[in-house]
Amino acid sequence: MMKKAYVYFCFVLAFIVVGCDDGATNPIEVKVQEETVLTRDDIKEDVVKDARDGETYRTVKIGNQWWMAENLRYAADSSLCYNDEEYFCKAYGRLYPWIIAMNLDTTYRRNGAIYADVIEPSHQGVCPKGWHVPTKTEWETMIEFVKAHNGTEGDGTSLRSPEMWAESGEGTSKVTHSDRFGFSVLPAGRHTDPMAGYDGNIYTGFTSYAYFWTSTEVNSYRNDVTKAYDVRVCGHWNDRAVQLENDKSKREAMSIRCVKN
């Protein structure tokens, strides 16, 4: 059922310095004059089949965008399973280094390369035909819609699946997971940059964080193009738990959610 409430507000996806802050973030400002509070019953759902491997994915319409409501499981070369265990790929989807997620030719697979000339506005990457790796702007659009239509509920609460998240630890005693929009974020964690000085094959964040690559590169004033934007969902907070990051190396492996062309 849909109910309407007229609220004037401004949400700012702020820089969190405790608990959910482990990297550089950019604020996502949302200005809404009229809010329509949506429930799960208002969200359209469908299913898409990946013709390459026969995998099927639940999809949801959030605003004007159709999103996969599950992490991609396509077994691209050099994609990973958390802790190198196949179970995690089946339950949480695969983890992809940015270059692999973008499905770029080996000619371009070199550290420091700028890929703007080979990345399409709707870049398919490892997604099935008719779908693509979302841009930074497409993620921002979705997050803005969620924050404009979830009432007083936090963005983390609205997007997280009620399954698999840690039930103990800093801040988690008051954390809720409504999955209001059916997006069903799972705490799949990530694989760290093997060239960043970490000791060994390090997977991190499982049960507490989800990380999703965008197709948008970070091109700073220092011309640092070894990084790309990602979206991190933290399990320790209800509000301001969804953050856009710009400090992760393209060598790190993260989850992929595809968006429809």
Mark where each language-model region is:
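Sec-dependent N-terminal signal peptides
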Residues: 6-14
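Conserved positions within compact, well-structured domain cores
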Residues: 23-261
